[in-house]
Regions:
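Transmembrane helix-loop junction
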Residues: 19, 70-71, 100-104
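Proteins with a high burden of low-complexity, intrinsically disordered sequence enriched in S/T/G/P/A and R
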Residues: 22, 43-46, 139-144
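Membrane interface segments of multi-pass transport proteins and intramembrane proteases
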Residues: 15-22
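Membrane-embedded alpha-helical segments that form the functional core of polytopic membrane enzymes
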Residues: 24-78, 95
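A feature for the membrane-embedded catalytic helix bundles of lipid/isoprenoid biosynthetic enzymes
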Residues: 1-14, 81-208
Length: 208
């Protein structure tokens, strides 16, 4: 399967990491450091491409932690919550930092607000997922992710899972062409659509 692209990288790195004395939570922590490094670099003029590379590394490790947990039979409830928390922090920091950087470069505070709106949308999605997963017992379902069936399912799956899974590559390409500022209006709108789609029945059942 071609998509998500990030899986092609993580599936090659995971066997290497599996031979090392590292735990899934340690890999998640390193992923967090790469994600925060991306946020810091994205604020600095001229460092966006390096920041994009940091985000790709963050995403690769974010996939490796779950794969390692499965291989080593080390899946835990805490690990799942930690992974979700790190995902939220990285994306919130990314959009907030991008807004700060573009606002400082242009002198226009509207970019700052777009960054904060996108970050706030990510926070709503995190809290909503935490509440809904706890209510539905999604983490204990044990049936695994289901495949989309109808048109509505595919729309939700593509937007919530496929775009999210390969978002790092979108950032990297935009950074190479100095177009990361376009992610601010897209993120400010998309982050709200993302958590609204979380309310669609069965949206939380899809995973890539």
């Amino acid at each position: 399967m071609l998509f998500p692209l990030i899986r092609h990288s993580s599936l090659r790195l995971t066997p290497v990491l599996a031979r090392l004395p590292v735990t899934p939570n340690q890999i998640t922590a390193v992923s967090l450091m790469f994600g925060l490094a991306c946020a810091w670099l994205i604020m600095l003029e001229g460092w966006a491409t390096v920041g994009g590379v940091m985000l790709v590394l963050c995403y690769v490790l974010d996939n490796c932690d779950g794969e390692i947990a499965t291989l080593k039979n080390q899946r835990t409830e805490f690990g799942g919550h930690f992974d979700t928390f790190v995902d939220w922090i990285v994306h919130a920091a990314f959009f907030a930092a991008l807004g700060i950087g573009v606002a400082e470069t242009t002198g226009n505070t509207q970019w700052l607000w777009l960054g904060w709106i996108a970050a706030a949308g990510g926070a709503v999605n995190y809290l909503l997922g935490f509440i809904l997963d706890g209510r539905d017992g999604a983490s204990d379902a044990g049936d695994g992710p289901r495949r989309p069936e109808g048109f509505k399912d595919w729309v939700v799956y593509t937007f919530r899972e496929m775009f999210r899974a390969d978002f790092c590559f979108i950032v990297l390409v935009m950074a190479v062409f100095d177009l990361t500022w376009l992610l601010l209006p897209a993120g400010a709108i998309g982050a709200q659509a993302y958590w609204l789609l979380r309310l669609v029945h069965g949206a939380g059942d899809y995973h890539v």
